[in-house]
Amino acid sequence: GEFPAFGDSQTRAIGTPDEGKTSWAVGDELLLEMTSKTLGTKYAAFKYNGSSWELASGELSYKEDEVPTFPHVYYAPNYKWETGKLVLKEGKVAGTDEYIEGKAEITPNGQGITVKFSGATRNYSRLRIATMPNMQITVSINRYIPAGSSKKIGLRNYALTSDEKGNAYLYGTFENNSEV
């Protein structure tokens, strides 16, 4: 969204709905975990090329006569699969992008995977900071749990870069008396 968001005539207040990401962009990734009764658990990343999803890393395999399950599917741009665990990509910092879990299932013909985020909800806050476009800023934060983590962070500085509309974001859970 732009600032002010969605054509509002004034700055938004706490509690104003923010729909967040509403469409896929080239380069977006989905992280899937698939379990096959015969072949076990496999992990893969799929990347959006503008019209379809392509396997970027990992593998998903199962026997023709079984229906695999997908215990987890994530849209978490800062993360990657590493030996069956989600870990931060090099140079990425927890809490500076989304971490949303969706649902997935194999299509009836076994030729595709249907991924849904329609029932997904953020279990964290998204704090938008309005500044100048494409500007680096430093934000100090205290008593905060970044999205995708269970570790509470004490006083820490975050280096953020605003987008072309002047928005920078933090994603996480803010405790009572958190400071930004």
Feature locations, PLM:
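Sec-type signal peptide cleavage vicinity
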Residues: 1-180
